[in-house]
Amino acid sequence: MRIGRIFILSLGLIYGICSFGLAGEVMPWVTPTSIGGFNTEVYYAHSTQKVKLVITGHETPFDYVSQKVNIKGTFRPGLGLELYILAGVIGSELKNGSPSYKGKMDAALYGGGIRYVMLGDIIILPAVSFALGLTHSSSYLTKENGTGNDFKLDTTELQGSVMASKKIGMVTPYGGVKFFHNWIRWKDEVGDKGKGSGGDISLFIGGKISLTPFLSIKGEFSFADEVTYVSGLSLSLGL
């Protein structure tokens, strides 16, 4: 019995070491920028999107500008599969000529999503992954040079992406295509309300630099129908 237990424990230890090695070599963290079982990322994002709000029965185009500071936690329950949750603060602004409507950087944002690495970063092949996530935020906007809240803006965004990356030493460049769609609801101070939407497809490129095996920095930029830049710091712990 004792020999059997030692044999089983030895197999378990070998399996654990091999599994961690396989995850580290074949399934690198490309977007969160680290290798390991759990990843924590703090980042700032600034984006501009085209949206349309229905006001008094007519669609009015706006530039929806947002600034976000988020904390994102990602866990890998299985090889190639990653689940994440995020929370943070957001400041929103709607621009349509003058005046604009702007909110303070104090609104709550939260969300989550899933990512799957279909093809690992091995030898000459890049890592290829798919991601899908949902976020929600609520902001109170004030007319430019105004003193009171003119209306409340609730925004829910669905975003998906296809990404390829390749680790080259301590640097990992990546790029891909993402789609996004916004569902927007607004309500002003006198009780009038409406809805709107926006979304399209954008290209993005970025890169990470691994400062240590556990600590990385990254930068990202997307363009076309959405203009976004992202910078962040990432800490990864192997489980």
What are these regions (language model features)?
Residues 19-77:
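Short glycine/proline- and aromatic-enriched beta-strand/turn motifs that initiate or cap beta-hairpins
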Residues 36, 63-69, 104-112, 152-158, ...:
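Residues that define the transmembrane beta-barrel architecture of outer-membrane proteins
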Residues 38-42, 83-85, 126-132, 173-177, ...:
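Transmembrane beta-strands of outer-membrane beta-barrel proteins
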Residues 44-50, 59, 87-93, 118, ...:
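Transmembrane beta-strands of outer-membrane beta-barrel pores
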Residues 51-57, 93-102, 140-151, 184-194, ...:
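Outer-membrane beta-barrel translocator domains and adjoining extracellular loop/strand segments
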Residues 58-128, 132-139:
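Glycine- and aromatic-enriched membrane insertion/assembly motifs of diderm outer-membrane
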Residues 71-77, 85, 112-116, 134, ...:
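Residues on the lipid-exposed face of transmembrane beta-strands in outer-membrane beta-barrel proteins
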